[in-house]
Amino acid sequence: MKPILLVGEARGEVEARMNSSFVGPSGAELLRMLNESGIITFTFADRDYLHRYYSQSDPSCIEAIWGLHPEVVRTNVFQIHPPRNDLEYFCGPKAEGIPGYPALIKSKYVREEFANELDRLADEIMGSDPNLIICLGNTALWALGGRTGITKLRGTTLLSTHTAADFKLLPTYHPSAILRQWDNRPTVIADLMKAKRESAFPEIRRPPREIWIEPTLDDIRTFKSTFIDQCKLLSVDIETSGQRVTCIGFAPNNSTAIVIPFDDARQPSGSYWPTREDEAKCWNLVRSILGDSRIPKLFQNGSYDVSFLLRAYGIKTLNCAEDTMLLSHALQPEGLKGLGYLGSI
């Protein structure tokens, strides 16, 4: 089994003194999260070292734990301790930046004099040849993915485009950020659990999807009879503009869906359907699906969708069985509940 490579941003004061990576408070927290996510498994020796670290503040205890787990390899983008832990130490104007790399911090570019750090990182990646690289924080995402925005991209599998190309990446928050904002810890645990699954193979595997778009009335009837009428749980979602539904989607399983549009900006009339009669027939099909009490339905924030359909179109939705937003709130009341976030974990 190939190791998982953990890439952080830069050495802290403790790491610089120990000439190592992740041996201070961030390293201790990272080890705990790796254990909780199943990437490593603590033994009695691990727990003893961790107890001694917290009681004695001895970073050699954290170094000893890392030594017990060859299944993970750790490094940083910069094996340098910037003064005051300020990443702007590495940065300058665009004219001084490393060619081909975007800004790291607010129009500030990593100066070309530090390009040797990226060369060293590339050598480390090629030497360990991991199936998966976990980018811990924005700097690692910048160095390997050629972009920033850790909050938006965390939990997403990507291919590296910079420094060492075509390695699978999974970005998540840096453990030092977790020490500052504990609410994000469950998110990192979820990302690391995904990382464990992804580390079994080097390629990015996307599940197959069959999505029917721009359907005719006959397409909708066929999809309904083939997939919807006998499904065990039907996912439903609407998009709205003002007091109109612009489109509605139905997914009878996790690989098949249909998107039924009502608005189309390409048409002079603004409507997807060529005639009012066709649109009325389409709404009758939608009404028959939503009003079928035999079909359990799943929503995300369904109170909005169901009330909107009833208020704007007089459509009563029967057998609203589940709501992913409410389920996620019941499971983790303090967590985020948006559909994008739920999909990322």
Language-model region placement:
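Conserved RNase H-like, two-metal-ion catalytic cores of nucleic-acid enzymes
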Residues: 14-15, 19-32, 37-39, 204-345
